[in-house]
């Protein structure tokens, strides 16, 4: 709904606004290990500390997260206010969070009272098959804030993003948004593309090329570095290799 969307200058501004609205200096944010490298300076600029949770083939290790939250409670440490993750075609790991873990993560957020910042940047760049429901779609509307952008879907210079959240949260973010506003020209152009179904059409055109690039990279790793453990993604831009 229109009242649940705040337009931003890309996803990074959305992440920054969320940090400024909810984090006090020195407070921790939960992130995956590894995580989106460009998000790290945003958290650092907001004086956040990090609680890193590992990943496996099914995405963020929710068992490890639950154990970490329990250990912090035993030590008398506060529950982190924010958890940041990219559940679809993770940057840089290429992983997708399983449906079972999405539900468990949502339940943990509700039980412990933290907010999930769901970065949906790569969600629409799917190579094949049906997508999983987003964390925000699984939520009751109170524990998930979604950030998105057209930069990865259409063009890097198209700095049009948005945050989807309940109106009360968006009011807090809008009060901090003092950049003069996202370019009306770019917003109008993005609106026209969206209204005409141009996103789906563009993604359908570029997916075969992205699949070709992925397959070439995977072949290269398997030929030149056969001992590497490779994540072969079903979407997005990233192949992750461990040696």
Residue spans of the language-model regions?
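Surface-exposed helix-capping loop/turn segments at secondary-structure junctions
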Residues: 1, 201, 221-231
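Conserved core segment of the aminotransferase class I/II
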Residues: 140-208
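Conserved core of the PLP fold type I
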Residues: 1-112, 123-141
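Feature representing long, continuous alpha-helical segments
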Residues: 63, 103, 171, 187-188, ...
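Conserved glycine-rich beta-strand-loop-beta hairpin in the small C-terminal domain of fold type I
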Residues: 208-218, 228-242
């Amino acid at each position: 709904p229109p009242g649940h969307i705040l337009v931003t200058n890309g996803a990074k501004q959305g992440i920054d606004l969320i940090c400024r609205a909810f984090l006090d200096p020195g407070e921790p944010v939960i992130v995956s290990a590894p995580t989106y490298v460009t998000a790290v300076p945003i958290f650092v600029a907001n004086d956040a500390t990090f609680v890193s949770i590992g990943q496996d083939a099914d995405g963020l290790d929710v068992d490890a997260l639950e154990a970490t939250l329990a250990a912090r409670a035993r030590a008398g440490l506060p529950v982190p206010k924010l958890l940041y993750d990219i559940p679809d075609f993770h940057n840089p790991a290429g992983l997708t969070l399983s449906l079972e873990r999405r539900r468990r993560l949502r339940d943990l957020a509700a039980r412990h009272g933290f907010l999930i910042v769901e970065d949906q940047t790569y969600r629409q760049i799917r190579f094949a098959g049906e997508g999983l429901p987003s964390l925000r779609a699984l939520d009751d509307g109170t524990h998930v804030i979604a950030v998105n952008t057209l930069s990865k879907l259409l063009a890097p210079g198209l700095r049009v993003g948005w945050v989807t959240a309940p109106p009360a949260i968006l009011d807090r973010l809008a009060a901090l948004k003092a950049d003069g506003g996202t370019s009306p020209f770019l917003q109008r152009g993005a609106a026209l593309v969206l209204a005409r179904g141009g996103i789906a059409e563009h993604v359908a055109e570029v997916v075969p090329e992205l699949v070709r690039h992925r397959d070439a990279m995977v072949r290269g790793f398997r030929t030149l570095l056969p001992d590497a453990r490779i994540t072969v993604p079903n979407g997005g831009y990233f192949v992750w290799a461990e040696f």
